[in-house]
């Protein structure tokens, strides 16, 4: 997977090396000076190689995206309630637990004032 993330860099590097090979001011002289260099690519061959690399990269990227979509469609994602630990939320959860519990506690249970306006900010009287 890491190879495909670096493929654009790899393709660009190959292109730069091909172009830089043709622009050398002082070419490397070897013992086989009379023979053509088998590693040198013509401009047309370089473009074909680059096009093939880009095409292979795009195909592989599309395949990976399709695999990821299929994995996410097949997985069962369950919704979970967000956890809240403020005093209001804890009080509300305790009140709910007490109201669901049976026995003596239920008979003597007096509901508490819980909710968004129970603690903290309260509505002001507009008459004053």
UniProtKB/Swiss-Prot annotation:
Residues 1-25 form the signal peptide. Pfam families: Calc_CGRP_IAPP (PF00214). This is Calcitonin gene-related peptide 1. The modification Phenylalanine amide is found at residue 119. GO terms for cellular component: extracellular space. Its main location: secreted. It comes from Canis lupus familiaris. InterPro entries: Calcitonin-like, Calcitonin/adrenomedullin, Calcitonin_CS, Calcitonin_gene-rel_peptide, Calcitonin_peptide-like. It is found in: Secreted. PANTHER family: CALCITONIN GENE-RELATED PEPTIDE 2, CALCITONIN-RELATED. Residues 63-83 are annotated as: Disordered. The keyword Lyase does not apply. CGRP1/CALCA is a peptide hormone that induces vasodilation mediated by the CALCRL-RAMP1 receptor complex. Dilates a variety of vessels including the coronary, cerebral and systemic vasculature. Its abundance in the CNS also points toward a neurotransmitter or neuromodulator role. It also elevates platelet cAMP. CGRP1 can also bind and activate CALCR-RAMP1 (AMYR1) receptor complex. Residues 26-80, 125-128 form a propeptide. Residues 74-83 have a biased composition (Polar residues). Keywords: Amidation, Cleavage on pair of basic residues, Disulfide bond, Hormone, Secreted, Signal. Belongs to the calcitonin family. One of its GO terms (molecular function) is calcitonin receptor binding. One of its GO terms (biological process) is adenylate cyclase-activating G protein-coupled receptor signaling pathway. Disulfide bonds join 84-89. It comes from the Eukaryota.
């Amino acid at each position: 997977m890491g190879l495909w993330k670096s493929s654009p860099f790899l393709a660009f590097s190959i292109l730069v090396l091909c172009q830089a090979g043709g622009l050398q001011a002082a070419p490397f002289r070897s013992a086989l000076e009379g023979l053509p260099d088998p590693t040198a690519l013509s401009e047309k061959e370089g473009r074909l190689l680059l096009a093939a690399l880009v095409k292979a990269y795009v195909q592989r990227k599309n395949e990976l995206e399709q695999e990821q979509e299929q994995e996410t469609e097949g997985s069962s994602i369950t919704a979970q309630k967000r956890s809240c630990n403020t005093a209001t939320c804890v009080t509300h959860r305790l009140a709910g637990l007490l109201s669901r519990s049976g026995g003596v506690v239920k008979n003597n249970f007096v509901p508490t004032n819980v909710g968004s306006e129970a603690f903290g900010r309260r509505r002001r009287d507009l008459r004053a």
